[in-house]
Regions:
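Auxiliary, metal-adjacent structural segments of Zn-dependent hydrolase domains
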Residues: 274-326
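Post-HEXXH active-site segment of zinc metalloproteases
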Residues: 21-23, 336, 340, 352-381
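Short pre-active-site segment immediately N-terminal to the catalytic Zn-binding motif
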Residues: 324-341
Length: 382
C-alpha cells in the first residue's frame, strides 16, 4: 500500500511533464526521462503531490479494515476529494470517466489503469490466492467492468501475492505471462526512448510490472518506472506496490515521503499496517483463525476516554485507537490449540456465558473466577 503511494507521489511531477508535452503534441526527451535514474536526484520534489492513485488506494484499505463495500468506499473517498477543488497542479483530481462514475448509479466499464494502481491493499491483506483474486475482481468491476481492466488487476494482485511469499522474479514473470497473457519481454531503453502516454490498462500495467522485474531494490524500481515516462505516477504506483512486497521500503524513503501524505491517509496507513502486523502475529503464534478474528472484530467497541459506561461482552478501545491494538490487551495466549485467550478483564466472559446457555450476572467480586470457569467449560464443549 505505502509502496503505491510513494510511487504515486514520486511520479506526480513527471506525469505533469508528460501530459503538458502531449498537449503540445511533443514528447519528453529520452535525456530528460532518464535523469531520475541519477540517485543524486531526489525522488520527491517540492511540487510533488499525492493524486487520485493514493486516495483510492486508501479507500480500498479503509474498506477492508471496515469490512465495507468497495463501491461505497471508492465513491465516498472520490466525492470527498472532488469537493476539495482542483489539485496542486490546477487540474481535476480525477479523470472524466471516473467523475462520471462517481455521479451515476451504474457500474463503470472503464479499461483504464486506475483499477490497478489502487488494488495493492487486497493482496497484502488476504492470505489465500483464491480469496485475493475474488476480492480483486469485486473491487475492480465496480468502476472497471472491462476484461482489460479485470486482467490488469489480476496481474498486479498475483505479482504482489507472489512477491510477499518470496517467489523469485522469474517465477513471477512466468506466472503473469501464463495466467494473464502479458508479454513482459520489454527493453528498458526502448521504453525510455519510445513509450507514449496512455492510461489504458493493457498498455501500461505490463510495463509497470516489467519495471519491477528489472529493478535492483525498491528505490531503483520507482526510478525505473518513472524513467519510461507516460502515466508516470500510476506506473510508479503499480511498480511500487509490487516492489514493496518484494524488497520492503527503506526507512529513509518512508521519512522523506511523510510531508506529502495528507493526515487522513496517514491515519489509514497506520491502521492498515498495524492490522497486517496483528495478522502476522497470529500466524507466527500458529493461532490464525478467521472465526477468532471475526470474534475480535465483532466484540470490539470504541469508547470515549472520559466515559464511565461499561460495555459488557466487549473489548474496549479508547477513542481512535485501532482494532489491531487488541494485541496489547491480549498479551498472553493461554492455549494456542483452542484459541483460549486471557481476556476476562475486558470481556466479562459474556460471549462464553451465551454460548454455554448460562444467564449473565455481573458479580464484580467474582467475575474473573467465573470467567475462568466458563472458559474451561467452553473449551471442554469445543
Amino acid at each position: 500500500m505505502l509502496g503505491a503511494i510513494i510511487g504515486d507521489i514520486a511520479g506526480s511531477t513527471y506525469e505533469v511533464k508528460e501530459v503538458n508535452a502531449l498537449k503540445k503534441n511533443t514528447k519528453v526527451s529520452y535525456e530528460e526521462r532518464v535523469k531520475i535514474l541519477d540517485k543524486r536526484v531526489s525522488l520527491f520534489q517540492k511540487d510533488s503531490s499525492y493524486t487520485d492513485d493514493s486516495v483510492l488506494t486508501a479507500a480500498i484499505a479503509e474498506c477492508i479494515l471496515k469490512s465495507g463495500d468497495y463501491k461505497d468506499y471508492l465513491k465516498t473517498f472520490g466525492q470527498n476529494e472532488v469537493m476539495l477543488g482542483m489539485d496542486k497542479y490546477g487540474r481535476s483530481r480525477f479523470g472524466k470517466g471516473f467523475i462520471s462514475w462517481l455521479n451515476s448509479d451504474t457500474i463503470g466499464e472503464s479499461y483504464g489503469n486506475g483499477c490497478a494502481m489502487r488494488i495493492s491493499p487486497i493482496p497484502m491483506y488476504f492470505s489465500e490466492l483464491d480469496e485475493i483474486l475474488n476480492e480483486t475482481y469485486q473491487a475492480t468491476i465496480t468502476s472497471h467492468n472491462h476484461n482489460d481492466a479485470i486482467n490488469a488487476t489480476k496481474a498486479v494482485s498475483l505479482a504482489i501475492f507472489m512477491a510477499k511469499n518470496h517467489c523469485c522474479k522469474e517465477n513471477i514473470k512466468q506466472a503473469i505471462e501464463e495466467q494473464c497473457g502479458y508479454d513482459l519481454n520489454f527493453n528498458l531503453k526502448d521504453l525510455q526512448q519510445n513509450y507514449k502516454f496512455t492510461s489504458k490498462a493493457k498498455d501500461s500495467v505490463p510495463q509497470a510490472i516489467f519495471c519491477f522485474l528489472e529493478s535492483d531494490d525498491f528505490e531503483d524500481a520507482i526510478r525505473k518506472a518513472i524513467s519510461i515516462g507516460g502515466d508516470a505516477d500510476t506506473i510508479a504506483a503499480i511498480t511500487g506496490s509490487i516492489a514493496e512486497n518484494y524488497y520492503g521500503i527503506p526507512q529513509d524513503v518512508i521519512r522523506m515521503v511523510q510531508p506529502f501524505i495528507p493526515e487522513y491517509i496517514k491515519n489509514i496507513i497506520t491502521r492498515f499496517y498495524l492490522k497486517l502486523e496483528f495478522l502476522d502475529f497470529l500466524k507466527q503464534e500458529n493461532i490464525y483463525d478467521e472465526k477468532f478474528l471475526k470474534y475480535l472484530k465483532t466484540r470490539t467497541v470504541t469508547t470515549p476516554s472520559n466515559t464511565d459506561k461499561s460495555w459488557f461482552g466487549c473489548f474496549s478501545i479508547v477513542d481512535n485507537e485501532v482494532l489491531v491494538d487488541i494485541k496489547l490487551l491480549v498479551p498472553e495466549i493461554e492455549n494456542k490449540d483452542n484459541l483460549l485467550v486471557n481476556i476476562h478483564e475486558y470481556t466479562h466472559a459474556y460471549d462464553l456465558y451465551q454460548l454455554l446457555g448460562y444467564p449473565y450476572i455481573e458479580d464484580k467480586m467474582n467475575k474473573e473466577a467465573r470467567a475462568k470457569e466458563m472458559e474451561k467449560k467452553y473449551l471442554l464443549r469445543k
